[in-house]
Amino acid sequence: MNDQPRMSKMRRYHAAVWDEPVIMEMGSKGRRGLVFREAEKKVADAVGPAELLIPQGMQREDPPNLPELSEQEVQRHYLHLSQETLGMMGISLFGTCTMKYNPRINEIIAARPEIAETHPLQDVQTLQGTLELIHNFDLILRELSGMDNFVFQAGGGAHAAYTHCCVTRAYHAERGELAQRNEIITSIQAHPCNPATAAAAGFDVITLPLEENGYPSTDALREAVSSRTAALLINNPDDMGIYNPEITDWVDIVHDAGGLCFYDHANFNGVMGKIRARELGFDACMYMLHKTFGAPKGGGGPAVGAYGCSKDLAPFLPCPV
């Protein structure tokens, strides 16, 4: 009998691979996942036809182009997709824009007590290492973006976009133009946090539609810009990965009208090292450090929205707390 210990043979990583069509190509006509019951007669008599509850201008003229599948088919479809979406520690579900791989060493460093267990009210002398990290990373982001200042208070991308909306308000208020400049322009394919934070900050939102090339036309922007324009909030590339090659013209148009330009770098992976926001003319930008960079994301740690701006906007940045 061989007393030598048995060595397990390492296998190459493998996961399920399905030849899965997109859901719009699946199903059969007339198939249903849920069949609604007919309304009781008393309810129907009291409420009337359901279509009368929808304003005429909002009623569809044609039936929606939706796939017709059973509940089991939908469940099986997304189960197959989930089995092909494996990360280092299991399924990776979280994220709306360009994702990337976080080396495990990054997760280990971020979980160290010197970082994860700091408190904003502890003795500043015990935070010098953390402050040095933040300062050095500030300089790195300035190099990548061309901006003059960065702050790291924002707890995520939407928070950083809201920071810019507040900076925009303060900038125009200082110039005596806040009452006039009440509109922020974005596109329908920009990250949803851009129109949402603009509205939360009290601005009216103008959303530009897409053309066949995948981004709004420059003429549409010209029509939207006016003396009421406070800022342009835009992703480039957008959330479909399409880069707008006319972006410098957009910046010039908004600047000529007295507005500010904000670059949402949610999809920075594709352009890092190729462009710099400030050199394109943008006044401010933000990075989600849980996307292009190594901060943990999802349940693994807090997000960070690094907000950078030109020296003209620096006086309106939030102060450290």
Question: Each predicted region: which residue ranges?
Answer:
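N-terminal glycine-rich, Lys/His-bearing helix-loop that initiates the first secondary-structure elements
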Residues: 1-117
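Gly-rich Lys/Arg/Thr-decorated short loops/hinges at beta-loop-alpha junctions or inter-strand turns
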Residues: 56-60, 112-125, 143, 199-208, ...
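Short acidic-aromatic active-site loops that bind/stabilize oxyanions
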Residues: 67-68, 123-135, 154, 158, ...
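Flexible, glycine/charged-enriched surface loops at secondary-structure junctions
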Residues: 88-93, 148-152, 265
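Glycine- and small hydrophobic-enriched segments that form the cores of compact globular domains
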Residues: 107-109, 113-114, 121, 128, ...
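Conserved PLP-enzyme active-site core in the AAT-like
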Residues: 128-129, 159-321
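Acidic-glycine-rich active-site phosphate/pyrophosphate-binding loop
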Residues: 131-143, 318-321
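Short loop-beta-helix segment that forms the pyridoxal 5′-phosphate
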Residues: 142-166
